[in-house]
Curated annotation (Swiss-Prot):
Membrane association type: Multi-pass membrane protein
Keyword annotations from UniProtKB, A to Z: Cell inner membrane, Cell membrane, Membrane, Transmembrane, Transmembrane helix, Transport
Gene that encodes it: yhhS
Cellular component terms (Gene Ontology): plasma membrane
Top-level division of the source organism's lineage: Bacteria
Disruption phenotype annotation: Deletion increases intracellular arabinose concentrations as compared to the wild type.
Similarity annotation: Belongs to the major facilitator superfamily. YhhS family.
Official protein name in the record: Uncharacterized MFS-type transporter YhhS
Subcellular compartments: Cell inner membrane
Amino acid sequence: MPEPVAEPALNGLRLNLRIVSIVMFNFASYLTIGLPLAVLPGYVHDVMGFSAFWAGLVISLQYFATLLSRPHAGRYADSLGPKKIVVFGLCGCFLSGLGYLTAGLTASLPVISLLLLCLGRVILGIGQSFAGTGSTLWGVGVVGSLHIGRVISWNGIVTYGAMAMGAPLGVVFYHWGGLQALALIIMGVALVAILLAIPRPTVKASKGKPLPFRAVLGRVWLYGMALALASAGFGVIATFITLFYDAKGWDGAAFALTLFSCAFVGTRLLFPNGINRIGGLNVAMICFSVEIIGLLLVGVATMPWMAKIGVLLAGAGFSLVFPALGVVAVKAVPQQNQGAALATYTVFMDLSLGVTGPLAGLVMSWAGVPVIYLAAAGLVAIALLLTWRLKKRPPEHVPEAASSS
């Protein structure tokens, strides 16, 4: 974790602009993720002629690389400072575009081209974990740890915005100039972000002996488990709401996803100070309650409007879960370990989203589509009980190094 600046007397627009000036680098990294997302599966399957397995693997490699590299990103951010980690991550995004470019240029050699695509995806996954973790910690170092919840919230907003913007733009660029043109756009986005990041003032890395990974994990795993359980609701909506609407014979699945995204982003914008005012655990419990109601409404929906209200509530409920629990998790460790704590905490969400799809698919094939939303509501209820227990337990002693944050 970077050494914090003196807690700045910032509020409102000025504070948000300071935060956005840093998290825009995470926006750039996620834009390089979103741009090829809707293009690569079809390119691998239809143009290169590989099976659906390989098309899926090309996409999944990025997520596996992100998952495996995220703890290292946190540790390096603690020891080297977050700015260096962000620049490193953006360089990975640039190299991923270079991988796509060379894959397009070697299209006459399908196996070589596929290997270059896979290499680009792995590098992108590593770059995303470094840029995402680093930008959060850099933002906290700039505006002060009092505003850590707001920094995490803004990081989520720019992530959603970049993914939503990137996918359709990527299709446009691909139809305009093929994979090579798309690759050049990705490289250009990353290069501009790197050039903007390099002149920015550096936030000093923390000085102090870091805790072993096992000790960090021991302090944050309960918060991570609550996050993982709550993420199941997001996972089943994002993955299976289209199948749910098809099974019911309804139209409007895409609009339901739009409602979820609007509720997610809108809640973060409407309640930027909620975590500071009533505490992270209290916010998390309120969010879990709203998410449970939403998932139950989807599961028992007999008309489209019920499902849409349920999806809206689920999006609003899930919106502040990550920052609310994240604020408490990172403050459970000394300052010099808070980067590692944030990265370790985030891994639980990565794992949850990775296993929710296959497990929900098995349940769905056995008991029907609506059941997965009822099951997800049950998991979020467990997260609510776990958070209630965390609130009731005596506060743990955190070493003095963490007291300033």
